[in-house]
Amino acid sequence: MTGEIMQKKRLFASFAVTALVAGSLVAASSVATAATRTVTVWAPYSGNNLVMWNAAIKRVEAANPGLNIESVGSIDMAKSLAAINAGNGPDISVSNGNGNLGWFCGSGAWQRLNSLMFGKNGLDVKKTFTASANASAISNGNRCALPLGSEVFGFYSNKDMLAAAGFKTPPKTTTELLAYSKKLTTFNSDGSIKVAGFLPWAGYYGFDMDSMWLGQMFGARWYNADGSAGFSKDVRWAKAFTWQKNFIASVYGDGDFEKGSKLLLKFVAAKGGEWGTEHDFMTGRVAMKWDANWMGPMFCTGDDWAMADKCTAKYEFTISGFPVSPELVGSNYGSGVVGQAQMGISKGSNNLRDSWTVLKALATDTKFALAWDTANGAPSSLLSKDARPAKYPDWYQPIYDIVAHPASAYHIVKNTGEHQEEALLQNLMASWQAGDTPNIKSALADLAIKVNQIVARNN
């Protein structure tokens, strides 16, 4: 993705490095004595999240006498990867988000886990983790990671504004989304946009309109069955981008795309702040939008990130799955984009047996998952009901429904470096909506070639 900014809870973005680690690992072989059995774990967590993480690590130590786990927090993904490749990284490291999985797996920085999962001390991942979490831990057909907590992207609707316009439920299809937006959008006397129904516009808010969300709406595939980039071969990409352009023309330009594009550009430039009560969704400047699960508490209380049973914001809102192309409503409606944090075992680890024990225990610790979910509203990757709060606000329930939906997913991940395919697709979307890309099919074909070249170069 382009324009990544440091977010309070975002899994896809890197955390700042606030601690430096010197020296090499104190790692022993699997046959070492109990006194020298040490596993080192690096994670990006800080503050209360690090406290929860370290509590889980203490539980693993207590269950494995003689095992010492050295936990280091505030280490971002880039530093972990650099240290692993330099030969002085940890036994285990945590990566915040699927987009970086190809980076760690494709480069060989994380070891393959297949033999460990099916061994004596193995793990039945299908019975342990959600479907989206399982899929997210595989890169280029290789499983090199176990998933942690989820980050969920759903569709937010201003319930009051929809009701005033005569709509009782959020839009389920892309056709309904356009119809809703036409009725909800209003203009000032000078012709500028006063209230926007929905903005299919890259660069609005950080996690509002994203090319990944657009692809999810139309069921578009990032990669073909043969492993090549699917942007050209899968016609649903061209269909999705064409829908975006027609939407802008129809809702905002009175049939004129150039007019609608210019009006949206001005509207976006005047948006309110992202982190507080001036956010456009909170002021009623926009009626419907995509966003992350952790934005829900802010929309609910204004400027308080804590989960509240009852919302105190100006408008009542609802969360649902993404609107989808009409032919997909039966199978895909109710789904969204679900990402995961990941953790893997470094290629330089000499203590594979104990590292696997720690990795498996941390990934399946229901107490940690419950504490994390309760504190952050981030649904666990685990299927176990013990890994999620026994009670959470009714307004937040749709987030869990999205996680459970079989069509919820993150796109297939390959080694493109720091998720370059996402950045390239987002750049294309920005160029397309600005009218700078005249032929979307040709542009998508060029994009597929670039991504194939990047993948080939990195493998």
Model-predicted segments: where are they?
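Extracytoplasmic/periplasmic substrate-recognition and gating elements
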Residues: 62, 141, 165, 303-378
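Conserved N-terminal structural module of periplasmic/extracytoplasmic solute-binding proteins
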Residues: 10-14, 25-26, 30-109, 118-125, ...
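Hinge/lid segment of periplasmic solute-binding proteins
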Residues: 98-153, 314-320
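Helix-loop-helix "hinge/cap" segment bordering the ligand-binding cleft or interdomain interface
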Residues: 62, 66, 118, 138-209, ...
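Long, aromatic- and glycine/proline-rich binding clefts that accommodate carbohydrate-like moieties
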Residues: 314-315, 320-321, 373-427, 431
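Extracytoplasmic ligand-binding clamshell segments of periplasmic binding protein
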Residues: 75-78, 220-305, 443
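Short, solvent-exposed loop/beta-turn-alpha elements that line the ligand-binding surface or hinge
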Residues: 114-129, 188-190, 194-202, 219-241, ...
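Short helices/loops that flank or line small-molecule/ion binding pockets
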Residues: 78-89, 107, 161-162, 178-186, ...
